[in-house]
Amino acid sequence: MKLAIDAMGGDYAPEEIIKGSLKALDHFKDIEIFLIGKEEALKGLEGKSERLKLIYASEVIENNEAPVAAIKKKKNSSMVVGLELLKKGEVEAFLSAGNTGALMAGSLLILGRIKGIKRPALAPILPTLNGATVLLDAGSNTDCDEENLFQFAVMGHVYAQKMFGIEKPRIGLFNVGTEEEKGNEVVKKAFERLKNSRLNFIGNVEGRDIPYGVCEVVVCDGFVGNAILKSMEGIAFVISQLLKEELSRNIFTKMGALLIMGGLKRITQKMDYTEYGGAPLLGISKPVIKAHGNSKAKAIFNAIKQAKNLVGNDVLRHIKEEIELTGDEISV
């Protein structure tokens, strides 16, 4: 399996991207990595592995650049070069921790959408009390209509099926209350479409329901989704810091911490976003993964693992098939 990695994207590029890529090569013997970046950034990697191919790109798309303009102007950027490799079929997936807007714009311009999909969605996996849930959209589409939300549900259904191994994943529509009549007109219309679909729709869910794990898929527009994502990341960090402070307060708390160290590690590991890799751009015609902007080697390794599973489970083909099956429920 051939995967392309943007070595120049993210807050800790290229060092941490390279470390994560080399770790993945060491761990997964069935992958080849095409590492894309400036020649000086990739210096010294020649001969590291026969499954590592270096692709030199002289430009980098920065986080503060306008997405569409950057994609069109910087044809030799690591991001554009990676997307072009994917388009040509030279690799099977592309991963970047770079500019999210540029990655989405480039994916749309270079790769295009799955037929029938109006808007792709960013779909991160969030940790919950009972496992994990897919959230979509997490920031790509701040304004959505009911058709967009319905399609997000279809894509989330397939993604959860293949990645979690659940035949009928539960789908919840994010709202300000669980009652059917709650929400704005878009959410109310989306509720009706989901209720009358073949999907395992459980109704409206509230913010507090997500960490409880009441469903495997949470559907919302990108504005709300991004707020949910960032809030959960912030809460996880605060809880982790509070635990560290309290358990190191004195000799007695330190002794207690030693006794529960195993449990604490499991809790912090479950709450750690780096364990869940990146977020696929579902709805794009080929596999593209967006890693977190502040990803270090561990997060990159897990994002590569996720890309491998996305390709191995043939998720995009199944999304295409599901969209065709639900064609009578979607006006394209």
From Swiss-Prot:
Per the record, the pathway is:
Lipid metabolism; phospholipid metabolism
Keyword check for Translocase, yes or no: no
Gene3D superfamilies of this UniProt entry? Isopropylmalate Dehydrogenase
| Catalytic activity of the protein | a fatty acyl-[ACP] + phosphate = an acyl phosphate + holo-[ACP]
Gene Ontology cellular component list: cytoplasm
Which top-level group of life is the source organism from?
Bacteria
Q: State its location(s).
A: Cytoplasm
Q: Which is an annotated GO molecular function term of this record?
A: phosphate:acyl-[acyl carrier protein] acyltransferase activity
> Keywords in UniProt for this one?
Cytoplasm, Lipid biosynthesis, Lipid metabolism, Phospholipid biosynthesis, Phospholipid metabolism, Transferase
Q: Which GO terms describe its biological process?
A: fatty acid biosynthetic process; phospholipid biosynthetic process
Q: What class of enzyme is it?
A: transferase
Keyword Transferase listed? The answer is yes
| Coiled-coil region list | none
E.C. code: 2.3.1.274
HAMAP family recorded: PlsX
Q: Provide the family line.
A: Belongs to the PlsX family.
| Classification via PANTHER family | FATTY ACID/PHOSPHOLIPID SYNTHESIS PROTEIN PLSX, PHOSPHATE ACYLTRANSFERASE
Q: How does it assemble?
A: Homodimer. Probably interacts with PlsY.
Q: What does this protein do?
A: Catalyzes the reversible formation of acyl-phosphate (acyl-PO(4)) from acyl-[acyl-carrier-protein] (acyl-ACP). This enzyme utilizes acyl-ACP as fatty acyl donor, but not acyl-CoA.
Query: What is the protein name stated in its UniProt record?
Result: Phosphate acyltransferase
Specify the taxonomic lineage: Bacteria, Bacillati, Bacillota, Clostridia, Thermoanaerobacterales
Gene field: plsX
